[in-house]
Amino acid sequence: MFIGGLHMIHKKIGAFIFQDVQNPNETKTTAVTLRLYALILSVYFLVLFCVCCFLRDVPSSLLTLICGILYVFAFRITYLNHTHFASIFSQLLTLLWITVFIQRFGWDCGVQHFLFVLLVLNFAVSFHRIRTKIFVGICTCAYRLLLYSYTRYHLPVIQLSTDANICIQTIDTLFIFAELITVMIIFTQNSQQMEHKLIRYNLELEHIASTDPLTGLFNRWQMYKRLETCISRYTQHKLQTLTVAMGDIDF
């Protein structure tokens, strides 16, 4: 009974997250991608909030709490037919908190790697032309180099200990990979399913074209093709014996 209850809760949560959009000009895939992106980052900031509370860093605790709340807001607005706004809001928010965290904790905190997640998200949910996406990629690369240059000339506001750096880097790595895997699965799932359907449909068409609809046996064209293959293998001594039986069902 307990397992059945958990299964029911899991189905309800899945149905809520994968709920379709009402706006005909927006896609379900984009909305679901943004929801999962915001949801994972909400959990990420909840974990960081606990870490900052453990370190007794009140300003950082408030900062992580605010970021988490903002991503909950980004998650919510995907259900209000504002997917485009949610996309822009989530990406700008990500750029903002990465900048603040680099300034506050320094390069070693590892949050700059979320720029890779941001780039993948932009490619997944954006419908712009290839040139625009390439331009966004170049700007993201330049911004990362700018952040690195900033940290070479400016000390962070808070000097984290080695243990704290390892802890935050570990958390960052886990959530970065979770974000990348999630976004890429959602982004590629539809295209892979469509390709699988096309392959299966082509195989069915090939089978129909090569068999007799009455008997289900090979038709004349497919039989000639099969015989040519067998004769070729026989002449190449890859087939020791070759037996051909011919019959006619029209009697």
For every predicted segment, state its role.
Residues 2-26:
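Short, Lys/Arg-rich, polar N-terminal cytosolic tail immediately upstream
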Residues 206-225, 234, 247-250:
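Conserved nucleotide-binding and Mg2+-coordinating catalytic segments in signaling enzymes
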Residues 31-107, 115-122, 138:
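Hydrophobic transmembrane alpha-helices and their membrane-interface boundaries in multi-pass
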Residues 30, 46-69, 81-84, 109, ...:
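Alpha-helical transmembrane segments and their interfaces in multipass membrane proteins
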Residues 123-127:
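Interfacial segments of multi-pass membrane proteins
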Residues 243:
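Cell-envelope/extracellular polymer assembly enzymes that use nucleotide-activated donors
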